[in-house]
Amino acid sequence: MITRFAVKNYRGFADKIVWDLSHPSSYSFNTNAIKDGVVKNGIIYGPNGSGKTNLGMAVFDIVNHLTQKFKKADYYKNFIYAGRQDNLVDFEYTFKLGEQEVRYDYSKARDGKLINEKLVVDDNVVFDHQGKNLVIDTKSFPMEPTFKEGLAQNANHVSIVNVLLTSYPLVEGHYLMKLKNFVDGMLWFRNLDIREFIGLETNVYVLDEYIIKKGLVDDFQSFLAKVSGQKFTFVKPEKNDKVLLCDYNGEKIPFDIIASTGTHSLMLLYFWIQKMDKATLVFIDEFDAFYHFELAFEVCKRLFALECQVFTSSHNTYLMTNDLLRPDCNFILKNNEIKSLCDCTEKELRWGNNIEKMYRGKAFEV
């Protein structure tokens, strides 16, 4: 699980912003939102322009250089804070991987090239690469001086994590393997004017074709009914069909034509839910942009029941309720800071509090 993330000089974040998930409160309700002492589920709120999208994408920067998973083509446009174009963007990650704490820090130039990189496991420095200087644990990773010098120079700006992964035989439980597996399972996506995603998959799919090919037509029909109350009757697909058809009084009408924007968004969500059994960390940006507030609540319940860490961003304060999460799982992002509700007030928050009403009444200060 990811327990802490920090970034500096990234897009709109001129100063360092820290998102700490490692200190949940001791609430006795909705305990499923906490796992192994770490916040497992959460929703990020904040005014327009506060940086919710930027924070989500910043967390997933690590996917760009540690995996071969799908990447956002224009990610490095507007990558660095406009007022400090010559500086580096600094990233800090802390993971809880089994019983080990893994800290991974790195810096990138404005074009995304990796400049500095450091890995610490349980307070032991595995390597520390700053510019052309490299300190590395040669007991764990024995190497010839020429090989070490090549790593230090790193003319191709390749991650040392990846070099070690490909150069040494490591057992499955090794911390580098666990780190790789976690990052491989990270997924960010959104569905606004266009559909975009980062991580988890290497391919792009046509949703109709995927649902038909996987034999999920009936399950998708049931999903729409349970989550949104919409009752579609899909035509049983023939061999080689690639388009979902709905039966309307004997007429076959393409689902794509009659589905609303919100229903199309649900279709994308359904697709990703099929993939989330192998996910480790999911961030859905503006997940409910096209959802009725009650539908958004039902979708959240389904997402937060998954085994992986799931976070969303939203403007829908109907979701800010102790019936869904807890005060330590609702975050406010404002003025280059992100804090949970319980850290934004001196009042003791309890299950019976109407935290949405308190939020609208400006009871929480970041």
What are these regions (language model features)?
Residues 4-8, 18-20, 67-272, 347, ...:
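Phosphate-coordinating catalytic segments in nucleotide- and nucleic-acid-processing enzymes
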Residues 58-63, 320:
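DNA major-groove recognition helices of helix-turn-helix
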Residues 61-73, 277-278, 305-307:
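Post-Walker A helix-loop "phosphate-sensing" segment adjacent to the P-loop in P-loop NTPases
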Residues 272-280:
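Short basic/glycine-enriched coil/helix segment immediately N-terminal to the Walker B
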Residues 285-287:
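Walker B catalytic acidic pair
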